[in-house]
């Protein structure tokens, strides 16, 4: 609790009182003069004179010439402050700081002090600096650290040197925010050795960004020796607090086994979490891991889904470069690989004028290598009735073959067929759910969306909004949310359905995430292939 009495600000030009000899006869005259002055002040204050209002407030605050009354003091300060009286605003801040006439509120006090300073009250800054020099007031240390760190209008310019002076004092008083700010100033100046102790101090108190920065420093040898194991420990804490950069950095360490044990599955989990926060590199990394079968079962369709999304977020050049770069020696290009052939075949299928005959030739080669998704795509070729060789029996045979090999895309397509029914297959509600579930378990996000839609609407299955939300969230984590799924999930947050709290902002953000169709169509129509060797 603050014990330092702060100076009240007043500037009203009231009639000065002559000093009198303290005798019995002088007292009534002095009291009478005070009463006259207070009455004049009150009349002026009631007429809206902000100087009079502020001065009257100081009288009631201090008990000068009137009986002390904090409530009345605050009333007059407030009236003057509404007229932008700079010193009255500061005096209101004092009331909030000390809890005089109102409940103590340090945040509001700082807000009012900064408003007063910004409006030109340099005297307040000087007063607080003097107070710190005399009494080491924690409140004033934090206030001064804040205004010098951020600047405060034209009255106080941003000053890192003075900011550091007060931030260090505040950090010594266990202010996490001050420690982070001091570290940030040093970090921006690339004075890493000076920054690290402050980041460590804040990290020790659980500050997520500081935990990430400690991990970054230890990982990259900034201001300290490289220690990947210690870095990973810090990064893990920050990642669990949803810091995307920490997720990425820890994911990279786990992916490479750099200083810690390699773990593709954990790396994948972290990349997906970062991808859900729209980190394009994380989106790309997930796609690469599906392409390579690292930490997950290899699946070219899911890989392409992720890579196409990354391409739409600015990484198309990466895709194009690797597509035509050879996979030899130290180069990790895709040219003449199975994935290259898969993408090549897909371009013929996704063209504005599909060439299924050419696609089938390429896919048949892949199918002979037991690449399940090739069977699925062959089925898709025969499913298109615009092709003269369309054949529903062949379509079903290929889908079922791929589904037996646990290809999620095949199960997804089968679920759609069982839902609608066709000449090749009868509608079967039970098989719809089973196939969607298999596709979902295989990581195919559109299947998760469809399951969510079923539980949201109560079609085929018993309506269960909570279960629908779980599928939608899982779909988001797996890189895709259909327009219908996004609208349904948004409505849950808009109305507070399925156990989620009403949140209009979250609803709005989710609605924006909805996608129509496949992201890969635009990518496949915009890439070029060099001639095969």
Residue ranges: model-predicted function:
Residues 22-24, 127, 131, 320-340, ...:
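Terminal, low-structured helical/coil segments at or just beyond the last alpha-helical repeat
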Residues 104-121, 298-315, 473-475, 487, ...:
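TPR/TPR-like (Sel1-like) alpha-helical repeat modules
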Residues 46-49, 62-64, 82-85, 98-100, ...:
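Short helix-capping/linker turns of helical repeat alpha-solenoids
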Residues 55-62, 91-98, 127, 131, ...:
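Hydrophobic face of amphipathic alpha-helices that form TPR/SEL1-like repeat modules
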Residues 12-38, 43, 106, 334, ...:
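Sec-dependent signal peptide cleavage junction
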């Amino acid at each position: 609790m603050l014990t330092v009495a702060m100076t009240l600000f007043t500037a009203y030009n009231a009639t000065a009182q002559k000093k009198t000899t303290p005798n019995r006869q002088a007292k009534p005259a002095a009291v009478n003069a005070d009463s006259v002055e207070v009455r004049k002040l009150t009349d002026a204050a009631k007429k809206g004179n902000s100087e009079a209002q502020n001065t009257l407030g100081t009288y009631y605050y201090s008990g000068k010439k009137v009986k002390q009354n904090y409530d009345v003091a605050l009333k007059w300060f407030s009236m003057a402050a509404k007229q932008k009286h700079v010193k009255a605003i500061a005096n209101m801040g004092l009331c909030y700081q000390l809890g005089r006439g109102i409940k103590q509120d340090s945040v509001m006090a700082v807000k009012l002090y900064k408003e007063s300073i910004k409006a030109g009250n340099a005297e307040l800054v000087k007063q607080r600096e003097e107070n710190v020099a005399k009494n080491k007031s924690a409140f004033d240390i934090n206030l001064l650290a804040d205004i010098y760190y951020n600047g405060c209008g034209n009255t106080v310019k941003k000053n890192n040197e003075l900011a550091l002076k007060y931030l260090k004092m505040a950090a010594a008083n266990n202010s996490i925010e001050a420690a982070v700010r001091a570290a940030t100033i040093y970090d921006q100046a690339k004075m890493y050795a000076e920054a690290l102790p402050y980041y460590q101090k804040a990290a020790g108190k659980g500050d997520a960004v500081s935990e990430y920065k400690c991990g970054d420093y230890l990982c990259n040898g900034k201001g300290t020796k490289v220690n990947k194991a210690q870095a990973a420990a810090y990064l893990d804490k920050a990642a669990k607090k949803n810091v995307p950069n920490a997720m990425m950095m820890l994911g990279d360490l786990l992916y490479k086994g750099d200083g810690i044990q390699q773990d593709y599955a954990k790396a994948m989990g972290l990349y997906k979490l970062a991808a859900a926060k729209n980190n394009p590199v994380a989106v790309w990394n997930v796609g690469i891991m599906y392409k390579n079968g690292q930490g997950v079962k290899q699946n070219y369709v899911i890989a392409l889904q992720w890579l196409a999304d990354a391409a739409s977020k600015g990484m198309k050049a990466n895709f194009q470069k690797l597509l035509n770069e050879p996979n030899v020696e130290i180069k990790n290009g895709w040219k003449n690989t199975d994935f290259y052939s898969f993408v090549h075949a897909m371009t013929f299928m996704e063209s504005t004028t599909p060439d299924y005959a050419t696609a089938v030739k390429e896919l048949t080669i892949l199918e002979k290598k037991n690449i399940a998704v090739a069977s699925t795509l062959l089925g898709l070729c025969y499913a298109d009735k615009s092709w003269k060789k369309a054949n529903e029996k062949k379509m079903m045979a290929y889908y079922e073959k791929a589904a037996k090999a646990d290809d999620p895309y095949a199960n997804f397509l089968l679920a759609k067929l069982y839902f609608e029914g066709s000449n090749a297959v009868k509608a079967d509600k039970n098989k719809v759910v089973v196939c969607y579930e298999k596709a979902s378990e295989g990581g195919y996000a559109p299947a998760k969306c469809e399951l969510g839609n079923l539980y949201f609407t109560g079609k085929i299955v018993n309506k269960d909004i909570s279960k629908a939300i779980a599928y939608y969230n899982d779909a988001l984590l797996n890189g895709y949310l259909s327009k219908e799924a996004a609208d349904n999930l948004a409505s849950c947050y808009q109305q507070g359905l399925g156990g989620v709290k009403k949140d209009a902002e979250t609803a709005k953000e989710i609605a924006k995430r909805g996608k129509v169709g496949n992201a890969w169509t635009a990518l496949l129509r915009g890439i070029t292939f060099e001639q095969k060797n």
